[in-house]
Amino acid sequence: MAPKKTTKKGGPQKRPSAEKRILTAQKRYLINQSFKSKAKTMMKKFEAALKAGDQSSITSGLQLVYSVADKAVKRGIFKNNKAARIKSRATLRANVKI
């Protein structure tokens, strides 16, 4: 491991703000990817509930899809239109099965 760079007073060396932004962007990318994966998993569970045809699991799955889509918009991961499109398509599929 390389030795840490320090200033004359012994504290850690300051980073330029471009480096800070790169680090922040990398952290947010990983967090956003995990949330997108969670959203896709919830949608797959909803699709499985539709194939099974159980009404209670369909309604609970639809609630999960709504919740995840709204949280993604709140966090800035999905845009409003994408969440609306996801919820609309899920509702249409649920109404056909119920």
From Swiss-Prot:
Query: What are the protein's UniProt keywords?
Result: Ribonucleoprotein, Ribosomal protein, RNA-binding, rRNA-binding
Q: What is this protein called?
A: Small ribosomal subunit protein bS20
Give the GO biological process terms: translation
- Pfam families given for it? Ribosomal_S20p
This chain's function reads: Binds directly to 16S ribosomal RNA.
The entry's family comment says: Belongs to the bacterial ribosomal protein bS20 family.
Keyword presence, RNA-binding = yes
- Listed GO molecular functions? small ribosomal subunit rRNA binding; structural constituent of ribosome
Identify the stretch(es) annotated as Disordered.
1-20
Q: Output the HAMAP family linked to this UniProt entry.
A: Ribosomal_bS20 (MF_00500)
* GO CC terms of this entry: cytosol; small ribosomal subunit
Question: Which ranges are annotated Basic residues under compositional bias?
Answer: 1-12
Organism this protein belongs to:
Chlamydia caviae (strain ATCC VR-813 / DSM 19441 / 03DC25 / GPIC) (Chlamydophila caviae)
Presence of keyword Disulfide bond: no
